Amino acid sequence: MKNLLGILVLGLLWCNVGLADNLKIVDGDTIILNGEKIRFSGIDTPELKQTCISGDQKVFCGISAKMLLVKKIGNETPKCIREGKDVYKRTLAECFINGESLSAFLVRSGYAFAYRKYSDKFIKEEEFAKENKLGMWSMKFEYPWDFRKS
């Protein structure tokens, strides 16, 4: 059973089936578009190997965030407004599908957090998700920035 779970997790990590040829989704807040690595500004999603607890079940919340993004993008190509570079030389941008901010969508769905250290842009969306116990707000979780420290 553990081997099957491991295979499933690996498959989901690299799942980009159905996406435009010029697009790869790295994780919940990072894409590669036309060879350019783009980090969504103002939000933070759980790391791919990060888990949450829902009832007595362990949930791969980082993979859930990525899969939500894959599903939202579908076979469309995001349009991104670049805002500069981060310390890792990734382009920081807000990206849109059919006029909707992917960052706002992820935060409002409860699988991303307003990254208050850098921006106050998505606080309303986070409050909505928290009040309605959406996504990770319905589980026990560790903030991604705390998870990365451990």
Label for each model-derived stretch:
Residues 2-150:
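Small beta-barrel nucleic-acid-binding modules, primarily SNase/OB-fold domains
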